[in-house]
Amino acid sequence: MATSLTWHDVLAQEKQQPYFINTLEFVGKERAAGKTIYPPQKDVFNAFRFTELHQVKVVILGQDPYHGPNQAHGLSFSVRPGVPAPPSLANIYKELASDIPGFEIPRHGFLQSWAEQGVLLLNTVLTVEAGQAHSHANLGWETFTDRVIAALNEQREGLVFLLWGSHAQKKGNIIDQRRHHILKSPHPSPLSAHRGFLGCKHFSQANQLLEQQGLSPIDWTPRLPEEA
């Protein structure tokens, strides 16, 4: 049964939990101590800002934010305008170019136009220290994103989850496959993309699954705001 819960409702419940309070407190103290934490504070929850719970059609799970300057802005795999696409995103574009007729690889890596169409771009850990991959793992973010996935599982039906790599696939264990669609492949990282991410055709498959439900497909060409 679907209800009209919003992300605000889900977040409000979690914000009262000790683990969540402790996580935010840790991140706040790290920032206050002068450490550079990505993404900036205002962007940490952007995935929920641009894709409301009732609008989600597709979920793409990432691991933790990019840890280089000016990259992370709260949407998994996406980078700010003007920043070159990192290697994993370059492979995502490569797959799109072979999977979606007419797809042209853009010169940017800004995926907000996906989010605005209903693609929840969710990292399972929402912050990271500059230059230190996975530095904020096991603080409590994973518990939070498990609750987010559980809310999607319970409140929605027919979502398409794209689970790339073992980390995302473990998260997928809580998704009811009778209610939702799960597409799995290796991670698009250069270390593993050639093992089956390239050639997975997840983007066209996701659109077919949406169209079978009478939903509009995703325009997978990432557009900058002035192009929209």
Swiss-Prot record:
This is Uracil-DNA glycosylase. It comes from the Bacteria. Pfam families: UDG. It comes from Pectobacterium carotovorum subsp. carotovorum (strain PC1). The active site is at 64 (proton acceptor). Belongs to the uracil-DNA glycosylase (UDG) superfamily. UNG family. The keyword Transcription does not apply. One of its GO terms (biological process) is base-excision repair, AP site formation via deaminated base removal. InterPro entries: UDG_fam1, Ura-DNA_Glyclase_AS, Uracil-DNA_glycosylase-like, Uracil-DNA_glycosylase-like_sf. It is found in: Cytoplasm. GO terms for cellular component: cytoplasm. One of its GO terms (molecular function) is uracil DNA N-glycosylase activity. It catalyses: Hydrolyzes single-stranded DNA or mismatched double-stranded DNA and polynucleotides, releasing free uracil. It is an enzyme of class 3 (hydrolase). Its main location: cytoplasm. SMART domains: UDG, UreE_C. The keyword DNA repair applies. HAMAP family: UDG (MF_00148). Keywords: Cytoplasm, DNA damage, DNA repair, Hydrolase. Its EC number is 3.2.2.27. Excises uracil residues from the DNA which can arise as a result of misincorporation of dUMP residues by DNA polymerase or due to deamination of cytosine.
